[in-house]
């Protein structure tokens, strides 16, 4: 019986009082075989096609005013988040994307850099974004307040969306995993096993979707300041 359901997210692996769980964020660089870097294979060809597709889509979202090479940042962001989401599905591996410490670290600097660049280099454009076209004069102050609040909470919504989706799926899998050992019926155990497999497939889809949503929204926020 678990004393705390959220204990699965605790960064508790330590050596000499130093937390090692956050190293799981970069564990992919250690476990990827060197052959992936030296010669093309099926995995690398598929992955390159995925990255090329994302590059084209992000380039379209950024528009003609987007800076050259800016899509590399968003494609890398997608790869980092998706890889860590998938790592969290493996047993005994720390899920770094289920913590606001990581998600806010990714979202807030991006949003802040976009805002600083926009307000310094494109001040009139940023002021124009505060009032949608066709807004009646009486509603302009109200719309400015709404747009300002929506801009300020953007990094928080980005971070919380990713964290909440990762936590929700892991909690369901943890609950089912703790229910199985207490059951003596083979029928119930079979149903729990099938449900666990279905949840694992669902979580795999969520891992891809949430990393894609995070990268796409970051790209859209960047396109607004150009």
Swiss-Prot record:
Topology in the lipid bilayer: Multi-pass membrane protein
Gene3D superfamilies for this protein: ATP synthase, F0 complex, subunit A
CDD domains: ATP-synt_Fo_a_6
Molecular-function GO terms, alphabetical: proton-transporting ATP synthase activity, rotational mechanism
Pfam families registered for this protein in UniProt: ATP-synt_A (PF00119)
Gene Ontology annotations for the cellular component aspect, listed alphabetically: mitochondrial inner membrane; proton-transporting ATP synthase complex
InterPro entries: ATP_synth_F0_asu, ATP_synth_F0_asu_AS, ATP_synth_F0_asu_bact/mt, F0_ATP_A_sf
Protein's cellular compartments: Mitochondrion inner membrane
Keywords: ATP synthesis, CF(0), Hydrogen ion transport, Ion transport, Membrane, Mitochondrion, Mitochondrion inner membrane, Transmembrane, Transmembrane helix, Transport
Function of the protein: Mitochondrial membrane ATP synthase (F(1)F(0) ATP synthase or Complex V) produces ATP from ADP in the presence of a proton gradient across the membrane which is generated by electron transport complexes of the respiratory chain. F-type ATPases consist of two structural domains, F(1) - containing the extramembraneous catalytic core and F(0) - containing the membrane proton channel, linked together by a central stalk and a peripheral stalk. During catalysis, ATP synthesis in the catalytic domain of F(1) is coupled via a rotary mechanism of the central stalk subunits to proton translocation.
Known partners and oligomeric status: F-type ATPases have 2 components, CF(1) - the catalytic core - and CF(0) - the membrane proton channel. CF(1) has five subunits: alpha(3), beta(3), gamma(1), delta(1), epsilon(1). CF(0) has three main subunits: a, b and c.
Name the UniProt record assigns to this protein: ATP synthase subunit a
Protein's organism: Aedes albopictus (Asian tiger mosquito)
Gene behind the chain: mt:ATPase6
């Amino acid at each position: 019986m678990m004393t705390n359901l959220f204990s699965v997210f605790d960064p508790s692996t330590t050596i000499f009082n130093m937390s090692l769980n956050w190293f799981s964020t970069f564990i992919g660089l250690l476990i990827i075989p060197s052959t992936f870097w030296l010669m093309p294979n099926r995995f690398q060809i598929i992955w390159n096609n995925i990255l090329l597709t994302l590059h084209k889509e992000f380039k379209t979202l950024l528009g003609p005013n987007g800076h050259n090479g800016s899509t590399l940042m968003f494609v890398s962001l997608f790869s980092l988040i998706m890889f860590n989401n998938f790592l969290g599905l493996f047993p005994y591996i720390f899920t770094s994307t289920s913590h606001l410490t990581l998600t806010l670290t990714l979202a807030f600097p991006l949003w802040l850099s976009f805002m600083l660049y926009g307000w310094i280099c494109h001040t009139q454009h940023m002021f124009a974004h505060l009032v949608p076209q066709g807004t009646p004069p009486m509603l302009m102050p109200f719309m400015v307040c709404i747009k300002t609040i929506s801009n300020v909470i953007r990094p928080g919504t980005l971070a919380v969306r990713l964290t909440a989706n990762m936590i929700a799926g892991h909690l369901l899998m943890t609950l089912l995993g703790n229910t199985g050992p207490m059951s003596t019926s083979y029928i119930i155990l079979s149903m729990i096993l099938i449900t666990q497999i279905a949840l694992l497939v669902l979580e795999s889809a969520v891992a891809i979707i949430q990393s894609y949503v995070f990268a796409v929204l970051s790209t859209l926020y960047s396109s607004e300041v150009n």
